[in-house]
Amino acid sequence: MEETAKKFMDVFSGLERAHGVYEITGQKNTAKGIKRDGRGRTLQEPLTLDLWKQHLAGKISIGVVPLKDDETCKWGCIDVDEYPINTESILATIKEMSLPLVPCMTKSGGVHLF
């Protein structure tokens, strides 16, 4: 797990003085489907290797601020919060347009496109 966490830390490097956390607080039925609710906040402390390991083990949810203090950015993410989400349509569009995106389901039921 340590080597995997180090790789994630390298690929998703970002702001070193702060990071986000997200906690699921419940879910609600909407006209468009089920949406999980949560609370996100920013902690003014570094994102450590131990926190990455906890995140990858599914114990906590973390968020990386991609923009660094030196105003560089190594990666980006599109957050799709459309409920109910049509993942087949999203995947078909990515393939049809040959977009260099990797889709990942989110804990709230949406999709992140990296």
Predicted region positions:
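A short, contiguous, amphipathic alpha-helix enriched in charged residues
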Residues: 80-96
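Short, well-ordered alpha-helical packing segments
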Residues: 9, 91-95, 114
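DNA replication initiation on ssDNA origins
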Residues: 1-75, 83-88
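Catalytic micro-motifs at enzyme active sites that drive phosphoryl/nucleotidyl and oxygen chemistry
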Residues: 62-68, 91-92, 98-107
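Histidine-centered divalent-metal-coordination microenvironment in nucleic-acid enzymes
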Residues: 77-78, 100-114
